[in-house]
From Swiss-Prot:
GO molecular function ontology, one term from the record: ATP binding
Protein family membership: Belongs to the protein kinase superfamily. CAMK Ser/Thr protein kinase family. SNF1 subfamily.
Compositionally biased residues, Basic and acidic residues: 437-461
Key words, A-Z: ATP-binding, Kinase, Nucleotide-binding, Serine/threonine-protein kinase, Transferase
Annotated ATP binding sites: 68-76, 91
CDD domains the UniProt entry points to: STKc_HUNK
Catalysed reactions, semicolon-separated: L-seryl-[protein] + ATP = O-phospho-L-seryl-[protein] + ADP + H(+); L-threonyl-[protein] + ATP = O-phospho-L-threonyl-[protein] + ADP + H(+)
Protein name per its UniProtKB record: Hormonally up-regulated neu tumor-associated kinase
GO cellular component: cytoplasm
Region feature (Disordered): 1-26, 437-471, 518-552, 590-615
Amino acid sequence: MPAAAGDGLLGEPAAPGGGGGAEDAARPAAACEGSFLPAWVSGVPRERLRDFQHHKRVGNYLIGSRKLGEGSFAKVREGLHVLTGEKVAIKVIDKKRAKKDTYVTKNLRREGQIQQMIRHPNITQLLDILETENSYYLVMELCPGGNLMHKIYEKKRLEESEARRYIRQLISAVEHLHRAGVVHRDLKIENLLLDEDNNIKLIDFGLSNCAGILGYSDPFSTQCGSPAYAAPELLARKKYGPKIDVWSIGVNMYAMLTGTLPFTVEPFSLRALYQKMVDKEMNPLPTQLSTGAISFLRSLLEPDPVKRPNIQQALANRWLNENYTGKVPCNVTYPNRISLEDLSPSVVLHMTEKLGYKNSDVINTVLSNRACHILAIYFLLNKKLERYLSGKSDIQDSLCYKTRLYQIEKYRAPKESYEASLDTWTRDLEFHAVQDKKPKEQEKRGDFLHRPFSKKLDKNLPSHKQPSGSLMTQIQNTKALLKDRKASKSSFPDKDSFGCRNIFRKTSDSNCVASSSMEFIPVPPPRTPRIVKKPEPHQPGPGSTGIPHKEDPLMLDMVRSFESVDRDDHVEVLSPSHHYRILNSPVSLARRNSSERTLSPGLPSGSMSPLHTPLHPTLVSFAHEDKNSPPKEEGLCCPPPVPSNGPMQPLGSPNCVKSRGRFPMMGIGQMLRKRHQSLQPSADRPLEASLPPLQPLAPVNLAFDMADGVKTQC
């Protein structure tokens, strides 16, 4: 079970360099034993929870008194996650106020649904969704940089290079939305926030719409958004498309470069505003703007949506990509997914081993971007860990042994310091300690020499004494081994090298990901149905007799159950008729596998029903078929005439082999009463001539259930 809210609390804040007594100094080390995260990351000081001003607690969140924003039916407040100690933004929607607006009531949960469909570094991350009787809560990441509009008010206007950076991030986020089929419809300066790294974060998907993905009818026919940022086709109440977001980006770009809006009318009138947009009567631009910026801005504010560029064309603009060194966004099938390699192993291990969550639940929730408490814990812990690593001068302080192993990709030092630490380890004092170990321990120690240890060790080691020749040989072998490890494809330490588990080790045989909880996350290949041609039946040679071969199966065209089919979807071409060869005489049945012994396509072999259950007369047919006889068409046809020289048998008699092969007319009781009777062969040809030679065994009884399953009872 997941840990309680107070399980991860520390008595004192684990701030770097903080003073305290002997008991306080021992607490971080105790928290680090057997842990996968630093104590500063995994623990929450009690003072942080006590000093946070709040008026309510909902789930694992404290709803703070500080208000970040307010709308007609919703308020955004600062919150605190009690399990991680991280601050979040909580949007509280009042259901009573929302009921007054039919549009809001109908689409109350749409914002949360849309935000779970997307994941982008310039879009706020939705962490959790909670609902009570009176309120609906959306928990999102907090952007401490504030609103971009406040920054424009302070500076009056932004420089062209800074505005270009913001506009490119905004276009990248909108392009990601459009690839996911989402149109924002309310892009304005007030909905652009800044994070701690001064990057754009797009918020407020309350008016966003999804192009038919979420099942909403007529998605592009409503009047929405602020009129100053709305495209002309929106003001004219015409049908519109994703290019309305391109127009809004142009308005935001004009506001960043000038500090004002491009189209304004006094007094305000929608008709006059629309006419000014159509006539391209834009307010004057600053003279210091470059030609490329002006040309790009005018293309975004094109009133004709046909001539206006789409979001992909805008992202490829030359002025926008000038001096840009970032990565080009790649087209992905699922815009809300991340790859397995992007997960933080330390955070996943902490959640599974310390907080008690299942490994498969954590991985599946994070990869699928499903807003719940698991995603919130992972995101906040990972963000806290990144902030801890970036703020530490020496990342090895307060880190435990396992953390260095599982975070080797992030904790790996540069090459220069890496080689320097290796040379330090080759000095006499440390090598004397290595030589005292056993050979196996010495080999393991040599494999782990590449880790950059703490600075305290460097002060105690001598700096001038040279190692002996045997020690130099060990150094060279160690360096060669480390180079091989660097060249390997795996970015995490192997289990055999460090004696630890790798939760993201892919097995080549089963194509699965082995987790630390002995569970397996399947990574199946694409399931593409393919037609498998049925092999042609064996044609007897000119010298062969009518007696079938020993190895010929007694059951032909067997219907396989779902349990006997492999992972690939096979579409088998079966013959029109299915004849099941079943003998009621004391003979032995050839050993078959489970798929051949199963007559029922729905139940596995060996499943039995009570014998008194009546058997459906059309499910199972009993036939002795001659291999040399021509194939017969299946249908409601009359039985072939019986030869005149043979004894006549009634049509429904169990001794009439041919009539039983087509129309079994007796019930389960008759078959059970006749099961000990011997079959009367026809006079023209003995029955033994059409059967393969079989070894005599003990008599067997056949029991039939309603699902056509056959089970031998000795």
